Structure formats: structure tokens, C-alpha cells
């Protein structure tokens, strides 16, 4: 995989294979991120290949998350019909960017500080 700048110029190459299974549960990953002071947001949850919803049929009830990321072309209403439990979450729409032309742009929001709570509240305010 290559790392590029905003002009598409190659800055570096990543030699490690980044698409590989891990030996921890999603719940453990969530706890790990939370313990580091982060906000755990499962990505591409509706994606047919490796997505949480197509693989498990639902979000695990013991997964303590508020946000889920859905794919760029997802229709929110269609997803809510297929997976009604998604109404319990704040849904972010982002892109799985492999090429610069696929980049959707920045997700901008205002936070009342730099704490995790302020960032969380800022995200909620734009959804």
C-alpha cells in the first residue's frame, strides 16, 4: 500500500499487509480504545465484504458504542429498514478511500474543547 499526499504524490510505502484478522474480539478492541481515551467507531458496518452487519446480522448488544460508520453510498433509510437497531446509533457516512478522487472531503464540526466528551458532542451536533 502507498501513502500519498493531497496531490497524489507517493510519500511512502507500507510493506506490512494491513488486511489481516486479529486475535481479539470487537468488544476487547472497543475497551482498548476506550481505555486509551479514544472514541471507538466501527467502520463500514454495512459493507458486504467483512462488514459487521452482513457478518453477524446485528451489532453485538454488549458492544458499548454510540457511533457507527456506514459506507459512502449507503442509503440510511434502506439500512434502517433492514437493520432497525441502527436507529439506536449515530451514523457517520465516510468513504473507504483507496484513491484521492474517492475522498469525500473533511467532516467538520465544532467542539467546545478537546476532551472526548466535547468531540463526541460536536459529532452528535452535525448528525
Functional labels for PLM-detected ranges:
Residues 1-5, 28, 126:
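Alpha-helix N-cap/helix-start capping residues at coil-to-helix junctions, especially the first residue
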Residues 1-15, 58:
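Active-site gating loops and adjacent loop-to-helix segments of metal-dependent hydrolytic enzymes
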Residues 22-26:
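Non-catalytic interface/targeting segments
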Residues 17-18, 31, 36-39, 46-127:
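Charged catalytic cores and adjacent phosphate/nucleic-acid-binding surfaces used
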Amino acid at each position: 500500500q502507498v501513502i500519498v499526499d493531497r496531490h497524489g504524490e507517493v510519500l511512502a510505502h507500507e510493506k506490512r499487509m494491513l488486511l489481516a484478522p486479529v486475535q481479539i474480539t470487537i468488544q476487547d478492541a472497543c475497551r482498548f480504545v476506550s481505555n486509551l481515551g479514544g472514541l471507538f467507531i466501527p467502520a463500514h458496518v454495512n459493507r458486504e465484504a467483512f462488514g459487521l452487519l452482513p457478518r453477524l446480522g446485528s451489532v453485538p448488544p454488549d458492544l458499548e458504542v454510540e457511533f457507527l460508520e456506514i459506507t459512502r453510498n449507503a442509503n440510511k433509510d434502506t439500512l434502517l429498514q433492514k437493520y432497525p437497531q441502527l436507529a439506536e446509533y449515530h451514523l457517520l457516512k465516510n468513504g473507504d478511500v483507496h484513491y484521492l478522487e474517492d475522498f469525500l472531503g473533511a467532516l467538520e464540526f465544532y467542539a467546545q474543547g478537546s476532551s472526548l466528551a466535547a468531540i463526541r458532542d460536536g459529532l452528535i451536533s452535525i448528525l
